[in-house]
């Protein structure tokens, strides 16, 4: 058989095999189109589980007459126009395949009217070449899509449809998920002429718990803990059920959204499960309704035919952010109120985990802000409940203010007691000295500095090593351990196992958590400066170092680790150098006063100036 271009109908049917799995898939695609059109009311009529009829009517912006034929063509869309748009998608649909694919396996009719038009127009595709016919019709502003006799021309696909009840249950679940994503939209669902679901729009700032309770049940609402967790361009909002009261029925409630798009993502589920694992049994699952907002440039939604999955460009960052957000809510349940007496309250040892330098924990920082209202509160019982924090109902991404981002990155100052705000002092009030101003980068890893008219060279790798040693050295409290996404399992000798067991308490202070069995050791958590390292190389070297020691001091181990960490910067930039020096000045002020050998070298310009003048 020679190579030939497939007929449009055949090509569309092949595409429909990926997009149109069952009637619920059709409902999902069409309702998402309505939401992208700005609809505030969507009516969904289903007959015989969607096999006979699926009708979606909305009050969105509508489609112009001259664009109706394009709407039923493949790869025609108003959502994106360039590669840049594809890399920062904020709409639910973008491929332009859904209507063409659905019309190839059903009798689809599209009726629409825009506010500028005096009359509505109806379009449908038919024939082998999928030619589109357009004719006048009566219709208010908005769009109606009717899908009749789904899979009528593909008997094999129609044969594998389940019972009417099962197919409608799948549609009902899709509508529940969409209703949880858009509280600002009224959604009505009917089956065989009977209204089954009515979700009324909630006004801005109104009560969201009524719809949450209607979809997830009062049992979930009574155990729900509200989350509002933010860092820079990442925001996590929603609810997670108290794991101490999770039941098998509640465990079925697992709804996750990324930039308003409903998602089934293993990375997100793993982060939530890991945060709850200490309170859940081996056979239990957490219950949650969570909304993640992220810079659209940092997530790829074009990786799954039905757009059920996404890929994060910085998956570990997102995982740790969600883990810390959920964990903070659960820990808040166990903490007592902050005392308000006159005794000084020690600030949490968060300095090593809140540095701007590479390897820091961007998210272990509830104390890194000025005192504000709680960002998360347990949802009260039904009745007279105040409105819980809720993500913006409108889809899309909004950049956070730069000032807020800067405040989130500040290191918390030791807190003596709660009192009226006073004028803030400079961050280095007790150590007003600094290395100076960064002029440029020399030989890729040295910073040329100017201070009080003097010029000096600073070795950035050496400064980074001192910073990491300070981050790793425990103070009054152990260094915060961060669980690994995938624990590292290594085979060890009897001598190495014995050394590890002797050093276990010292390693725990450094944030290194492990479990050992007969011949293996499993590294479960490491401090943040180690998260970006190649642990397959570093940990065996650390075990070899410990096997040669007889005394295990956390400070000595931290020094060894700092000296053996690989630098993340083969070529340093000005911004990276400035950030590093700011961290060193705050965390290691003694280096400014008495720089160790190999860190700082003054540069004498007088001979060069003299030579120029002599010329």
Swiss-Prot record:
Pfam families: DNA_mis_repair (PF01119), HATPase_c_3 (PF13589), MutL_C (PF08676). Signal peptide: none annotated. Keywords: DNA damage, DNA repair. GO terms for cellular component: mismatch repair complex. GO terms for molecular function: ATP binding; ATP hydrolysis activity; ATP-dependent DNA damage sensor activity; mismatched DNA binding. Residues 364-391 have a biased composition (Low complexity). GO terms for biological process: mismatch repair. Residues 363-397 are annotated as: Disordered. SMART domains: DNA_mis_repair (SM01340), MutL_C (SM00853). This protein is involved in the repair of mismatches in DNA. It is required for dam-dependent methyl-directed DNA mismatch repair. May act as a 'molecular matchmaker', a protein that promotes the formation of a stable complex between two or more DNA-binding proteins in an ATP-dependent manner without itself being part of a final effector complex. Belongs to the DNA mismatch repair MutL/HexB family. NCBIfam families: mutl, PRK00095.1-1. This is DNA mismatch repair protein MutL. It comes from Escherichia coli O8 (strain IAI1).
